[in-house]
Amino acid sequence: KKVAPIGKRLAWVLASALLLTGCSSGQNDTDQHFSLGDTVSTAWFDYTVTEVESTQEYGGYISAQGDQLVVVELTLKSTYPQAVTMFDSDFQISWDSMSQDDTRCMPVEYYCDQQLPTEYELAPRESRSGVLVYQVPDDQSTFQFTFQEFFDDGTQEGRPGDQYVMDLTPQA
């Protein structure tokens, strides 16, 4: 059972601190690693990153000076018998030289129809495709795209489950 939206957001905030610490100091040996095109099976859904590109502009959004946009196209397919509340922040991006307080690991705010919404329901057996857009330093070329499971255990934070890491090198 997935954590309620408020608890999930708090859980992600807490997990982000751990995740970002891990990204700046090397990979966690318990992470499951995947590559572009692999289908990843989580407790609630399968997802596949079908394309990743770097650009200075996407859908009218222009990257800040010194940054680039990394556009991750993915397909999600529910494997859970109940609706699952999803957030764009469920998927985070990181890079080797990233500082712990860098908020660019989260997708930019929803601004175009191609993006996955900030919050949405993934119905049983539903498939959904969209993009997540991240603004990252333009001197970076390799990224880790991460999803962390959290299970409802009666606490505000939830119990962490598996973490899935996909190594991505965007095409320019």
Q: What kind of region is each of these model predictions?
A:
Residues 131-157:
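Short, surface-exposed ligand- or partner-binding patches at beta-edge/loop junctions that are enriched
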Residues 1-12:
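Bacterial N-terminal signal peptides that target proteins for export
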Residues 24-27:
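Bacterial signal peptide processing site
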Residues 45, 70-72, 128:
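Hydrophobic core residues within well-ordered beta-strands of beta-rich domains
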Residues 55-71, 82, 121-123:
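Short, solvent-exposed beta-strand/turn "edge" segments of beta-rich domains on protein surfaces
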